[in-house]
Structures are given as C-alpha cells and as structure tokens.
Amino acid sequence: MSTDSEMSEDMTLWEVLNEMRLEEELCDVVLRVDEVEFKVHKIILCANSPYFRSLFIRWSSLDQKVYTMTTVSPDIMAIIIHYIYTQEIRVTTDNVQAVLVMADYLLMRDLVHDCYDFLKAHLSPENCLGIWQYADTYSFRKLQDWAYSYTLRHFEDVVRSPSSEFLELNEEQLGGILERDELNVKQEKTAFEALIMWVEHEPDIRIQHIANLLLKVRLALIDLEYFLENIKTHPLVSSSWECQPIILRTLKAMFYINEFAHNTGYPDPLARPRLPYSILFAVGGFSRRSATNIVETYNSRMDTWKCISSREESVRAYHGTVFLDGFVYVIGGFDGTECFKSVCKFNPLDRTWNEVSPMTSRRCYVSVAILDGYIYAMGGFNGRERLNTAERYQPSTNQWSLIPSMHEVRSDASATTLLGKIYICGGFNGDECLFTAECFDPRYNQWTQIERMHVRRSGVGVIALNNQVSAMGGFDGAQRLQCLEAYNPRTNSWRMLASMFNPRSNFGVEVMDGRLYVVGGYSTEGTTSNCEYYDEESKDWFDVQDMNVFRSALSCCVISGLPNITDYTIAYDDFL
C-alpha cells in the first residue's frame, strides 16, 4: 500500500487514480475477461462510460462485485481501462479497430473520436478500402466518409498498390467508385484500366458486369488513339455484345468533341468531366495597362477558367501568392502608384478577404515561398531601391521577422521550396538581369550561393518539380525567353530541357497534378492570356485554355481538396 509520502505532490489527479487502481486501493468492482481480472472503481468507470453507468446502476444489483465481459479480449480491455484512468490512448495500427469497436460499445465518445483521428492519420492506399469496409460494417459513418474520400482522392495509388483490397471489391462497390465525379484520375484511361484489372482477377464471374461498369467510365474523354487501340479492340470488350452500343456512343461523343474542340455541352455521361481535386488560382497582375484584382481559377478536368473576383481585394501586380493552412496569402506588390508592404489572406471556404500583419519592408517584384509553416518574402523593390533583405511570417503569431539577407540584391526573381531549403533564382539588381541563384537553409539560418543558370533571367518563373528546381522564361536584357532549365541539388548543376511554346516573362507558375503550368505574362507581342503546361513524363509542353483576361505580373497558387470545389469551377451542366 502506498504511503502519503510516496504520492508526489506533483502527481495529477489522473496519475493518483491510476496508481490507486494499480495498487488495488479502494477498488469496489472486478471486470473479468476470460481468465483475467481487472480491479477497478465503479465511480471512475461510470464517469467515463454511459454503458458502465447503466450496467452498475440499472442492470445489476448494487452489491454485485464481479462482472464478466464477453465481447472483448483482455488486451483490449487493458487498453480501455488504461485510457479511462489516464486519458492516454495506447492504440496501434494492429489494435485500433478492436479498440474502436469496444469504445463504441461502451459509449466512450472521446475514445471513439481519438480512434477515428488515429485511423484518419494512418489512411494509406494499402488500407483505405479495408478501413472503408470496416467502418461500413460497424456504421462508423464519419470514418467511412473519410476512408471513401481518401480512396477517391488517391485512386491511382490504390489501384497500383499490390496490398490494397481493390481487387476484392464487389461490382456495386467498384461501380460506385467509378461513377463518382470526385474520382481523382489524371487521365480517364486509368479508370478503364482499373476496371479491366478487376474483371481479369476473376474473369469467369466478373465478365457479366463489364458493360454496366464500362458505362461508369468517361470513355469519350480518353484519347482517340488509345481508345481505338486499347478499348474498342480489347478482348473483354469486343467479345461482349452489350459493350458494342457503348463503343458506338463513345465514338459519336468523341466526334462531337472533336468538331467543337471542347467536351462542354455534350449531354452524355460518357463525356462528363470529373471534378478536379486541385484548382489553380491566378491572382491579380497587370491588365489593360493597370493593376487588377481579378482572380481566375483553372479546372484541368474541363480545361476551363472561371472568374471569381471580389471587390473586397485591392488591385495588385508584381506580388507573391501562396496557399498555407487553408488560406491564400497575397503578399506585397504594386497598384500602379504605390509599393505595398501589406498582406491579405483569402478564405476559400467563405470567399472572404482579411488583412494580416504587414511586412517590415515594402516589396513589389517580390519572391515568396513557404517552408515549415512559414511564409518567406525575399528581395523586391521598395519604391526607391532593389532589396537583398528577406523576412518570414508565422501565421500563428501574425508576425513577420527578418532573416539573414541574401548575397545579392534581387527584384523580379522567383523562389521555390525543395527538400527543406528555399531556392531563389535570377532577377534584376538595378543594373543587369541575373543568372545567379542561392538557397536558404533554415537549419543554419544562412544563404548559400549555388551554380549559376545558363541564361540571365529577370521576370523568371521558378518551381520545384521532380526533386529539381525548374527555371523558365524571363527576360535576359534583350529578349523574352522560352527556354527551361532544371537544377539538381545533388550535383549542383543545371541542364536545359524542352522550351515553352511561347516566350514570356512575369508570368504565373505552379505545379498541379504533376504538371508544370505557366500562366499569362508578358510575351513578345505584349501582355498575354496564353497558358501551357510541361509534362515530366513525356518531356513535352502542351497548350491549355487561355485565361479570360490578358495579364502579366500575376501570381499563382494551387489549392487541393476543397469541400466546396464546385464554387471554383464552371458547372458542366451549365453548358447543356
């Protein structure tokens, strides 16, 4: 038995109660699980579980001392009791599902939520389908929705994972996934290939479902050559008489899309674009010789731009834009008269703008990046001189603080984050366009110069892609550029890649769905609305739909997973 002196004054109430349990002090009830007995206190269990409260008060006599629990193992019961007495959860990926079932049975709401959070944090392509089906079995609706949304979002990885349970889905479950607008596939052929993989797992049984499932695939959005070579002639498809009308419908839809050069407006589910998981935001810039507050969003699934401008936001050009912790931050810039130190943030859920703490310096032609929860603003022009100073913003404290200055003065540069460092490249120092570059390592709080680019670039676009720093476009002092080069941090070297279709400077740049997008800017003919993207796999550039507005000096960011994604896309049904 513990003495009062042994109970430290520093012990919390929970620690005291747990020690009393372990020492079997004042225990007044025994829970028997198989051959294991747990001596506990009725009042503590009643305070944490409505089930135990009813068991001890309503469903048994007051003098009953031993209760047999038949729906749980001793190991899980030990975890439950430890949680009741300490509020500490001891779950692992191996036992969390059993703990959750028992916590739900005991009506322990807080423990249920803790298990939910644990499972949500550990969702993966390998286990999401299993968790979805488990949650469905036990009617854990919130967990079921999380797992299902994860499956839709990471569908390509789920299908590729050899340890996922994709091939064990039934026809109804697979059909439900394939028909969802939210299914996140970069190319629709992925959905078809997943369907074929599923059928081929048990062809004799599943071939009867192929026509019904084929209707769930947006076949008319697939490349015609691939469709003719891999779908129309596929043995499982060509041998099914039920599939032949679907093939004809698809070809008819493809003909319409080809004739009108777009997939909008054709009233067939086979041609219905899916909703994007990510949206590209293009913010502000110069248009018609003046700064603008225009915001457009790009939907890669429909290849369309939508204007979502708000009068609440001031006009800005030569600013920076980032997305962090649920907000779009617009940093610094120029309104045609004044260089800004102000910073505004946009909430994409309710579409409201609010100002946050301003920077320590005015900065237009500013370079921005995010790293480890901070927003970095570097270089720029304050209305009098070009800057080499840099600072960072912490949203939780709403404060900016200076970091060491860069080695060189830079305005009109561009920055990105890669492997825990910030890279800034090119720019203009007031006398010449720069081909120098440097990186900031927050671990050592210092800047380090890296190998120079092959080309001088002011108004350059810089972005991380495939573990390299890509720098493209810009102005070299004589002409706008269309060349692209990539920096490898391991070798400290640059190499030239495929050039853009169009030369441009002062444009927006972002990576979305593994593609490098360049948006608007200043070209050889003036301000442009032209957009294109670079595909890392093919090493080629491709045209995309022009913006609605000609703009240069704009800035871009990407937002993924918005629950109100339809607010930022043109509804397909609007074209019908």
What is the predicted function of each stretch?
Residues 1-10:
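Cytosolic, low-complexity regulatory segments enriched in Ser/Pro/Gly with interspersed Lys/Arg
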Residues 13, 48, 65, 76-77, ...:
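Generic hydrophobic, aliphatic-rich segments that mediate packing or membrane embedding
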Residues 73, 92, 108, 124-125, ...:
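Alpha-helix initiation and capping sites
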Residues 9-14, 513:
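Short Pro/Gly-enriched beta-strand edge/turn motifs at strand-loop
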Residues 11, 50, 74-78, 82, ...:
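Amphipathic alpha-helical interface elements that mediate macromolecular binding in regulatory proteins
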Residues 68, 208-576:
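Kelch-like beta-propeller repeat domains
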Residues 95-97, 111-276:
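Alpha-helical protein-protein interaction/assembly modules
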Residues 19-127, 164, 170-202:
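Canonical BTB/POZ domain core
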